[in-house]
Amino acid sequence: MSPSDVPINWKRNLTVTWLGCFLTGAAFSLVMPFLPLYVEQLGVTGHSALNMWSGLVFSITFLFSAIASPFWGGLADRKGRKIILLRSALGMAIVMLLMGMAQNIWQFLILRALLGLLGGFIPNANALIATQVPRHKSGWALGTLSTGGVSGALLGPLAGGLLADHYGLRPVFFITASVLFICFLLTFFFIRENFLPVSKKEMLHVREVVASLKNPRLVLSLFVTTLIIQVATGSIAPILTLYVRELAGNVSNIAFISGMIASVPGVAALLSAPRLGKLGDRIGPEKILIVALIISVLLLIPMSFVQTPWQLALLRFLLGAADGALLPAVQTLLVYNSTNQIAGRIFSYNQSFRDIGNVTGPLMGAAISASYGFRAVFCVTAGVVLFNAIYSWNSLRRRRLAIE
């Protein structure tokens, strides 16, 4: 048994990586509420220009993350996951600090791209835990870990808005850099990893990685599932506030209502992910995945017919509970169908598909709503998720038949 296969106090590592994912999720979302305001402060004027630059600085991070993730995953498989976590936390802290000092929009755009290049904390945290936790507890552990990033992402916008109101926009970037540096310190002092470095010659090439997979087709279908999950989530984001305003009519607290409806899926996922992950360890993550996808379809369709914001909020809460099972189930199936030797790359490829979904989802939602209205977005998204449910079921059925 190689050192990388020996679990070393994985429960402590799970706790520390959960805190790291929480801080990373919070740090990323701290600046999200006022990105357009900061773009404006950097000299961009005019409605069209502001919209264009805001979209660019938002999406470029995901684009560069999608490009860089496989490289960092390969390096993690060679050098170990802890060193990549340290590199990511420290690199992002420095970039966030520099963002607070940006003097023009081009500097800010380049720094947002650099943030994507240097990211990768959460996928490598997943890879670290996946290679250390006992296989029969993978679903629970990865489900629990996923709640760290979700919790941070929920808290971040609220904290970022309050900090920006009290201290201004630039100081929030400095505070965010401090949060990421704390993440670096936690990782440095408390995460333990037994890893035997692998020389570049001994590293498996992409073809060998594919050949080493137990079921390459299934792994590809899991990557596609990750992409579609993010497309489905992101397609609703651009139109949610406008749809809520259409449902609520002329009310004074539309921002509060929209914010609440935007956050309820995250709260539900936070509650459901560990429980459904544990259930997946008992009955199989493939069953959890297919059932959660079908439930998502059944909840998305009625969203296009709701008459009040509270009906939408209830459906989104239930959708969040189902969604809380999806990514952990995908990650658990990736663990089952790969080896520790290639875990970093497999999780990084999965992250690349997730980043592509983060970019294409909002574009799809905006295009559909512009052509056919808000309600059509939910129906089209339901169709995309239904396709994914059928595709995933077929891939899992083929694997089962091959085993039999």
From Swiss-Prot:
| Location(s), subcellular | Cell inner membrane
**Transmembrane among keywords:** yes
Taxonomically, which superkingdom?
Answer: Bacteria
Taking the first listed entry, what is the main subcellular location of this protein, grouped into a coarse class? membrane
Q: Name one GO cellular component term.
A: plasma membrane
User: What pairs make up the disulfide bonds?
Assistant: none
Sorted alphabetically, the keyword list is: Cell inner membrane, Cell membrane, Membrane, Transmembrane, Transmembrane helix, Transport
GO-annotated molecular function: transmembrane transporter activity
Q: Which InterPro entries match?
A: MFS, MFS_dom, MFS_MdtG_subfamily, MFS_sugar_transport-like, MFS_trans_sf, Mutidrug-R_MdtG, Tet-R_TetA/multi-R_MdtG-like
> Topology in the membrane?
Multi-pass membrane protein
> Any transmembrane segments, and where?
19-39, 56-76, 90-110, 113-133, 144-164, 171-191, 222-242, 254-274, 288-308, 317-337, 376-396
**What's the family?**
Belongs to the major facilitator superfamily. DHA1 family. MdtG (TC 2.A.1.2.20) subfamily.
Q: What is this protein called?
A: Multidrug resistance protein MdtG
Per the UniProt entry, what species is this protein from, by scientific name? Salmonella typhi
Q: Gene name?
A: mdtG
